[in-house]
Curated annotation (Swiss-Prot):
SUPFAM superfamilies: Phosphoenolpyruvate/pyruvate domain (SSF51621). The lineage of its organism: Bacteria, Pseudomonadati, Pseudomonadota, Alphaproteobacteria, Rickettsiales. Binds 1 Mg(2+) ion per subunit. This is 3-methyl-2-oxobutanoate hydroxymethyltransferase. 3-methyl-2-oxobutanoate binds at D42, S43, D81, K110. It catalyses: 3-methyl-2-oxobutanoate + (6R)-5,10-methylene-5,6,7,8-tetrahydrofolate + H2O = 2-dehydropantoate + (6S)-5,6,7,8-tetrahydrofolate. InterPro entries: Pantoate_hydroxy_MeTrfase (IPR003700), Pyrv/PenolPyrv_kinase-like_dom (IPR015813), Pyrv_kinase-like_dom_sf (IPR040442).
Length: 277
């Protein structure tokens, strides 16, 4: 049975919400068996396309990957990130968000920002588009924030994040991502906000957690401090590639067990090549 936003909200304070990113059909199919929520994140720009940041990710890219992920799911809620500069007015936000939902079949969109995007969030929610909020460290704002740094370390920054989170919730977001903030602030917001908080680098005080799946699986040697690598796929893949190349070079692959047997037509062709033509 497909989870919906009410199912996610009902888990607040009762059951931790497990979320991961996915960008492809095969990965989404695996995640769907176990995760409550799958985010088609704009982190696809860095993890799949090798971009320096998320700022170059386009709406078409998000829709293409959203389609692939939705095709694979049978249970998890699927949320698609709205890319940079795709929601700077309520009307533009609705135009692009409605396209994402209609073309991918996803359940909701995610917007980065607090007070500055509250109007856009309210505009979408009022028109039937569920929204996931995102405050704290916001990758689309990294130039303004001075890089990818922990947020909320000063009193003014802490207050700003609290105002952002409150504005997002009041605008109608069904849950909110808290990224790279202190454990005490995450705990305070989780207690105060009426909707689930999903942490990424924000401690286990949050109602749920999310990670970039490539980081969690150890597919890169570079990853943030807050990531726990539950596998080491980078070395597993390297070992597999080395083994494959060695087997090819030594003519060990393909073996007889990997080849097809001759059918009647081929046997005739080999015995009487001119007659088989």
């Amino acid at each position: 049975m497909l989870l919906n936003i009410l199912d996610i909200q009902a888990k607040k304070g009762l059951e931790k919400i497990a979320c991961l990113t996915a960008y492809t059909f095969p990965m989404a199919r695996i995640l769907d068996e176990h995760c409550d929520l799958i985010l088609v994140g704009d982190s696809v720009g860095q993890t799949v396309y090798g971009m320096e940041s998320t700022l170059s990710v386009t709406l078409d890219i998000m829709i293409a990957h959203g389609k692939a992920v939705v095709k694979a799911r049978s249970k998890a809620l699927v949320v698609v990130d709205m890319p940079f500069a795709s929601y700077y007015t309520p009307e533009l936000a609705y135009k692009n968000a409605s396209r994402i939902l209609s073309e991918t079949g996803c359940d909701a969109v995610k917007l980065e920002g607090g007070v500055c995007v509250a109007e856009e969030i309210a505009f979408l929610v009022a028109r039937g588009i569920p929204v996931m909020g995102h405050v704290g460290l916001m990758p689309q704002h990294f130039n303004q924030l001075g890089g990818y740094k922990c947020q909320g370390k000063t009193d003014s920054s802490r207050q700003h994040i609290k105002e952002d989170a409150k504005a997002v919730c009041e605008a109608g977001a069904f849950c909110v991502v808290l990224e790279c903030i202190s454990p005490s602030l995450a705990a305070e917001l989780t207690q105060e906000l009426p909707v689930p908080t999903i942490g990424i680098g924000a401690s286990n005080a949050c109602d749920g957690q999310i990670l970039v799946v490539d980081d969690m699986l150890g597919q890169s040697s570079r990853y943030p401090k807050f990531v726990k690598r539950f596998a080491d796929l980078e070395h597993t893949i390297k070992d597999a590639v080395v083994g494959y190349v060695r087997a090819v070079k030594c003519s060990e692959f393909p073996g007889d067990e990997h080849c097809y047997s001759d059918g009647p037509h081929l046997r005739v062709f080999r015995a009487h090549p001119h007659h088989a033509q």
